[in-house]
């Protein structure tokens, strides 16, 4: 059974009087920095000199330093730059300036789990991973709520690493919603598997294939778009709010019967076995190796694949339909 922490299980006291350096001021970095400051904690920001985010962070009242300087001033270092940029920045600007006993926080376990970043033994290494985009992290905090998060400890030098992680989670508002204790391995692997087989890869391909079938059968592309893509949000909202069974009780009996009898024939045991094979590639590290090598080459395959999606007929029809819907 998962261990879930809420506001009553966490305290901001471990962070009182300490300096927190947020490295990166993108959507997630900005949200977490603002939330922590609004929680009464001292936050500075570490950025590349001359980057676009420097002036933004400064205009919002933060002391901004180059990354190495921010790290040298910090008791807590939150690494909130993109995954694939982290190893280089870590090696050149973070690791040389870390204080003994510092707390290093990540929002995703990829680089630690796959050994691309290897922290020294004399620091705590934790993860607080909000399960929502940065915009929601900020908006929910301002509304007096929070988004759920995962929390993990990779290295417990101080003996209090979990307390620090929970304090960070409380500071960004996550304990208001609930924080699940996990491991770097579990967070990383489930995140990648979920993205590839369901949330990004699986859902995207299911929608594209459904659109292709309807158009190839002679139905109007505009009608096909609404049926397989636009209405997907309505169904996902129901699932998010009520669960799968609750969603079924929110649609017609015809939709229920058709979905329950035909769905398993489409997403069958063969599909499940392919999903498991993809999951095993993640677990073995094969996917991470492939992606790191692809990124090092300048991501040519990713760029080609992105272009193919951009040119898919559903995108051309969708652009017109979204103009009708959203102006």
Curated annotation (Swiss-Prot):
Annotated residues for binding of substrate: 252
Q: How is the cofactor bound?
A: Binds 2 magnesium ions per subunit.
Residue ranges of the KARI C-terminal knotted domain? Answer: 183-327
UniProt: Mg(2+) 2 binding residues: 191, 227, 231
Short name of one Pfam family: KARI_C
* Reactions listed under catalytic activity: (2R)-2,3-dihydroxy-3-methylbutanoate + NADP(+) = (2S)-2-acetolactate + NADPH + H(+); (2R,3R)-2,3-dihydroxy-3-methylpentanoate + NADP(+) = (S)-2-ethyl-2-hydroxy-3-oxobutanoate + NADPH + H(+)
| Residues noted as binding NADP(+) in the record, renumbered to the chain | 25-28, 48, 53, 83-86, 134
Q: Which cofactor does it need?
A: Mg(2+)
Residues of the active site are 108
**What GO molecular function terms would the record report?**
ketol-acid reductoisomerase activity; magnesium ion binding; NADP binding
The chain positions of domain KARI N-terminal Rossmann read 2-182
One example of a Gene Ontology biological process annotation: isoleucine biosynthetic process
Alphabetically sorted, this entry's keywords are:
Amino-acid biosynthesis, Branched-chain amino acid biosynthesis, Magnesium, Metal-binding, NADP, Oxidoreductase
Per UniProt, the enzyme's principal EC class comes to oxidoreductase
Binding residues for Mg(2+) 1: 191, 195
Per the UniProt entry, the Enzyme Commission number(s) are 1.1.1.86
Q: Which family does it belong to?
A: Belongs to the ketol-acid reductoisomerase family.
Briefly state the protein's biological role.
Answer: Involved in the biosynthesis of branched-chain amino acids (BCAA). Catalyzes an alkyl-migration followed by a ketol-acid reduction of (S)-2-acetolactate (S2AL) to yield (R)-2,3-dihydroxy-isovalerate. In the isomerase reaction, S2AL is rearranged via a Mg-dependent methyl migration to produce 3-hydroxy-3-methyl-2-ketobutyrate (HMKB). In the reductase reaction, this 2-ketoacid undergoes a metal-dependent reduction by NADPH to yield (R)-2,3-dihydroxy-isovalerate.
The name on file for this protein is Ketol-acid reductoisomerase (NADP(+))
Source organism of this protein record:
Pyrobaculum neutrophilum (strain DSM 2338 / JCM 9278 / NBRC 100436 / V24Sta)
């Amino acid at each position: 059974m998962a261990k879930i922490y809420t506001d009553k299980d966490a305290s901001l006291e471990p962070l009182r009087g300490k300096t927190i350096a947020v490295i990166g001021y993108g959507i997630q970095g900005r949200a977490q920095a603002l939330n922590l400051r609004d929680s009464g904690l001292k936050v500075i920001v570490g950025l590349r000199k001359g980057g676009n985010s420097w002036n933004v962070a400064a205009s919002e009242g933060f002391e901004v330093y180059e990354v190495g300087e921010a790290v040298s001033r910090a008791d807590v270092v939150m690494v909130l730059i993109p995954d694939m940029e982290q190893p280089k920045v870590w090696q050149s600007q973070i690791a040389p300036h870390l204080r003994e006993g510092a707390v290093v926080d990540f929002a995703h376990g990829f680089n630690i789990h796959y050994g691309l970043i290897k922290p020294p033994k004399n620091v705590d290494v934790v993860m607080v991973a909000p399960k929502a985009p940065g915009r929601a992290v900020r908006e929910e905090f301002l509304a007096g709520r929070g988004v759920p998060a995962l929390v993990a400890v990779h290295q417990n030098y101080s003996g209090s690493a979990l307390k620090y992680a929970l304090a960070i989670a409380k500071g960004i508002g996550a304990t208001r919603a609930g924080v699940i204790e996990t491991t770097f391995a579990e967070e990383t692997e489930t995140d990648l598997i979920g993205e590839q087989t369901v949330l990004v890869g699986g859902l995207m391909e299911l929608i594209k294939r459904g659109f292709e079938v309807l158009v190839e059968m002679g139905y109007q592309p505009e009608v096909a778009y609404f049926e397989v893509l636009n209405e997907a949000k309505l169904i996902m909202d129901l699932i998010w709010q009520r669960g799968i069974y609750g969603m079924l009780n929110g649609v017609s009996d015809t939709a229920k019967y058709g979905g329950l009898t035909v769905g398993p024939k489409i997403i069958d045991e063969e599909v499940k076995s392919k999903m498991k094979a993809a999951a095993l590639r993640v677990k073995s590290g094969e996917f991470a190796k492939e992606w790191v090598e692809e990124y090092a080459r300048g991501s040519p395959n990713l760029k080609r694949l992105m272009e193919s999606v951009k040119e898919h007929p559903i995108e051309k029809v969708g652009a017109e339909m979204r103009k009708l819907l959203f102006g």
